């Protein structure tokens, strides 16, 4: 046995002596061990041979990479104690030794990733792609000395959780790109501590926490829930409904008690967290009690009521935990900056100003510069007014939640992040960037966000080129970069808020646009050299082709079946990286149904022979907007064989339909047909809504519940304003005893067609 051990030791020394060495302290921390593992993994591929990891004092061969708190580093005057948790240092001692040092738990890891990026051009562009140029030499400049720390203290880009079997890859991808906050993903990402990940926000979670604070309340706390417009305090079912009564002293007491419990529980687990989030539920409800509404008048904003509530909590907790900072959100109606109130020094205001695709107070054009674009003048004022009152955290939106595919964020990203950092002095940033599969250049958007959150002074254009070369290949990159600029230029030509524009209403998305864009993609695919590069390009082709199909429905493509097949194949190739299995199955099912609908022979319109029909909307354009209540049903007498239907109501509640314009409610209309005047044949009939003026966000609805809805924004024209004035006709069928005397059918209202017709000359 003794001879075997001696032989093994000799082999180890020979192996170490035959190659460059990564040197760890004699007793390395977990972060130092991980940093060495990362170096060995990537450098081995870059230089084409193993790079061994040894402990300090073990025989090895120069050049040496000294990782962490080594005696060698200490001998050069570099003490680990001097570093902040995310601070890092690269310092060469000639060409034979390099010190990679930093703080715990992440600084030393950041030093290793900085070295890999700066000296070997190694990148992590998405969760499954690692870009490592091969055939390199392990070398550096003899006078190399770099140090730094992240620009934003808390950094998070939220893309959405993937399947559990992908969570490890996701954790590593985020950590390598120096994100330190994963929202609620922190609780399901396995053992992330080896990558330096710790909780950045304390319990209970990282968003919409009111519900967590109230979950244990009993009937005796009824007065602490928000009061509705009927004068009743109601317990919310979840965070999507209801709020709290913030003027009630008992609510303050309960929140203070719960916060203390959270702090104590976190510290018992070793999590000494600085920031705790106390934020409203995810809705725009306000407590209607007299005291809360009086506070709203006093502060000229619902935000003032919330700040007054949070101030009391901060004041109570400060006595025992003066270092704790409370983050609260200026959300929905609370987004208006208050007057006549000072904000406690330990309170930070989070600013989630949502895009104009949402109704209400939301006006922001999230794809444009806050500081420079005229569409964001109002929101810039809101941001700066809050920043005058308190330190601010940014909750940003890098995605449109409607028709997001062909709106690029590239131009606005660097402008906005630098505005938040330099002008608003924010050091906390969370960005929602969902739906990367259906977003043009989604991986680039996320990766560039990583770069600027980490280093606000990064050369943005150079970083863009670097990503393009790594992700699409140096030969295809020029075409993909030109495609990005082409789409950006087209976006810039639209004066309307992109969040309010439907796909059909976008004036920049012409058939010529798609033809030119396809040219860039075709040339890029021809230039790409590897299957991986082609796969990445085909993901962007999917976004273009799918939006082309949805807008023009193959009118510009003679080979319909081949085009539709290409879309599906590109989706199936790339979707597993970005979407859950159930989401993929749902998309494929809906896509196939949509393609079937495009091939359906629609019944001709009758009764409008002397009118000019501007738009004829049938299935599959008619689709569910309130899926729980509305169904797409097969129906032989429907114009396209399918229709939207609402049923499951047991009595007559009105034969009502209307037109709603969120941008100009005075433009809205509603009509009700008296029950006695309803046709009794249970067939489709046309009903006129009268003349309307189309806008980017307008829609029609059917039934007093509004559960049947259809957007007319697709029909809005930014270039032919005269076509926005039209008369709307709905083809509706009323069935069942609620509408037809003596009927044996179920009660149902069905919409199969919407006609927009040129108004008659007066």
Residue ranges and their predicted role:
Residues 327-358, 405-412, 438-446:
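Substrate-binding cleft/loops of secretory-pathway carbohydrate-active enzymes
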Residues 296-312, 316, 343-363, 450-458:
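Acidic, His- and aromatic-enriched active-site or binding-groove loops in soluble protein domains
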Residues 702-710, 731-745:
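Short beta-strand-plus-loop segments that form exposed binding edges in beta-rich domains
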Residues 692-703, 722-729:
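Noncatalytic modules at the cell exterior or secretory-pathway interfaces
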Residues 35-38, 42, 80-274, 280-308, ...:
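Feature activates predominantly on carbohydrate-active enzymes
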Residues 247-253, 261, 368-482, 493:
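Structured mid-domain segments that build the active-site/substrate or prosthetic-cofactor binding neighborhood
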Residues 449-672, 678-680, 685, 752-754:
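Catalytic domains of carbohydrate-active enzymes that cleave complex glycans
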Residues 6, 16-89, 130, 134-146:
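Acidic, contiguous N-terminal accessory segments
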């Amino acid at each position: 046995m003794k001879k075997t051990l001696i032989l093994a030791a000799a082999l180890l020394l020979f192996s170490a002596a035959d190659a460059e060495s990564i040197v760890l302290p004699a007793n390395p921390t977990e972060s130092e061990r991980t940093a060495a593992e990362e170096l060995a993994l990537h450098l081995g591929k870059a230089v084409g041979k193993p790079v061994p990891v040894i402990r300090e004092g073990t025989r090895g061969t120069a050049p040496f990479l000294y990782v962490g708190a080594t005696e060698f580093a200490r001998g050069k005057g570099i003490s680990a104690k001097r570093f902040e948790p995310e601070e890092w240092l690269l310092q060469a001692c000639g060409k034979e030794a390099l010190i990679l040092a930093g703080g715990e738990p992440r600084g030393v890891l950041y030093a290793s990733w900085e070295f890999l990026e700066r000296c070997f051009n190694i990148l992590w562009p998405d969760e499954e792609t690692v870009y490592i140029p091969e055939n390199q030499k392990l070398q550096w400049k003899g006078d190399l000395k770099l140090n730094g720390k992240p620009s934003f203290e808390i950094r998070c880009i939220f893309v959405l959780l993937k399947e559990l079997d992908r969570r490890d890859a996701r954790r590593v991808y985020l950590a390598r790109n120096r994100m330190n906050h994963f929202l609620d993903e922190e609780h399901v990402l396995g053992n992330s501590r080896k990558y330096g990940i710790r909780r950045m926000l304390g319990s209970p979670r990282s968003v919409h926490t009111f519900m967590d604070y109230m979950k244990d309340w009993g009937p005796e706390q009824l007065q602490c829930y928000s009061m509705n417009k009927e004068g009743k305090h109601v317990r919310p079912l979840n965070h999507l409904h209801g709020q709290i009564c913030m003027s009630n002293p008992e609510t303050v007491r309960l929140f203070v008690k719960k916060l203390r419990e959270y702090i104590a529980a976190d510290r018992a687990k070793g999590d000494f967290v600085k920031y705790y989030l106390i934020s409203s539920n995810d809705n725009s409800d306000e407590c209607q009690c007299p005291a809360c509404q009086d506070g709203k008048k006093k502060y000229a904003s619902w935000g003032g009521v919330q700040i007054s509530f949070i101030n009391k909590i901060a004041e109570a907790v400060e006595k025992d935990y003066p270092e704790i900072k409370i983050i609260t959100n200026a959300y929905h109606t609370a987004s208006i900056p208050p007057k006549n109130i000072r904000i406690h020094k330990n309170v930070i205001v989070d600013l989630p100003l949502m895009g104009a695709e949402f109704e209400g107070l939301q006006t922001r054009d999230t794809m444009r510069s806050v500081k420079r674009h005229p569409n964001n003048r109002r929101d810039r004022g809101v941001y700066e007014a809050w920043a005058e009152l308190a330190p601010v955290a940014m909750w940003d939106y890098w995605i449109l939640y409607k028709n997001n595919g062909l709106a690029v964020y590239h131009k606005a990203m660097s402008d906005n992040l630098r505005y938040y950092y330099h002008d608003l002095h924010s050091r906390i940033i969370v960005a929602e960037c969902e739906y990367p599969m259906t977003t043009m250049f989604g991986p680039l958007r996320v990766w560039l966000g990583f770069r600027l959150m980490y280093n606000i002074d990064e050369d943005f254009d150079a970083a863009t080129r670097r990503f393009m070369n790594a992700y699409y290949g140096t030969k295809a990159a020029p075409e993909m970069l030109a495609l990005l600029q082409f789409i950006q230029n087209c976006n810039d030509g639209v004066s309307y808020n992109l969040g309010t524009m439907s796909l059909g209403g976008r004036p920049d998305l012409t058939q010529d646009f798609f033809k030119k864009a396809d040219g860039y993609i075709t040339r890029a695919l021809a230039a790409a050299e590897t299957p991986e590069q082609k796969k990445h390009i085909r993901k962007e082709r999917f976004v273009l082709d799918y939006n082309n199909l949805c807008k023009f429905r193959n009118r510009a493509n003679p080979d319909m079946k081949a085009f539709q097949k290409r879309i599906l194949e590109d989706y199936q190739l790339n979707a597993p990286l970005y979407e859950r299995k159930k989401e993929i199955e749902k998309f494929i099912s809906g896509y196939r149904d949509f393609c079937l609908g495009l091939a359906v022979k629609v019944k001709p319109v009758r009764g409008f022979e002397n009118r000019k029909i501007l738009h004829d909307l049938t299935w599959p354009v008619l689709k569910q907007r309130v899926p729980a209540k509305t169904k797409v049903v097969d129906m032989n007498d429907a114009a396209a064989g399918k229709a939207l239907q609402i049923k499951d109501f047991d009595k007559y509640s009105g034969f009502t339909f209307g037109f709603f314009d969120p941008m100009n409610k005075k433009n809205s209309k509603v009509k009700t047909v008296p029950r006695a005047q309803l046709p009794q044949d249970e067939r489709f009939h046309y009903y006129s809504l009268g003349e309307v003026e189309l806008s980017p966000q307008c829609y029609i609805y059917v039934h007093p519940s509004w559960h049947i809805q259809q957007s007319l924004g697709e029909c809005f024209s930014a270039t032919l304003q005269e076509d926005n004035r039209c008369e709307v006709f709905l083809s509706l069928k009323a069935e069942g005893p609620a509408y037809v005397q003596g009927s044996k059918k179920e009660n149902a209202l069905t919409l199969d067609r919407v006609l927009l017709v040129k108004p008659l000359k007066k």
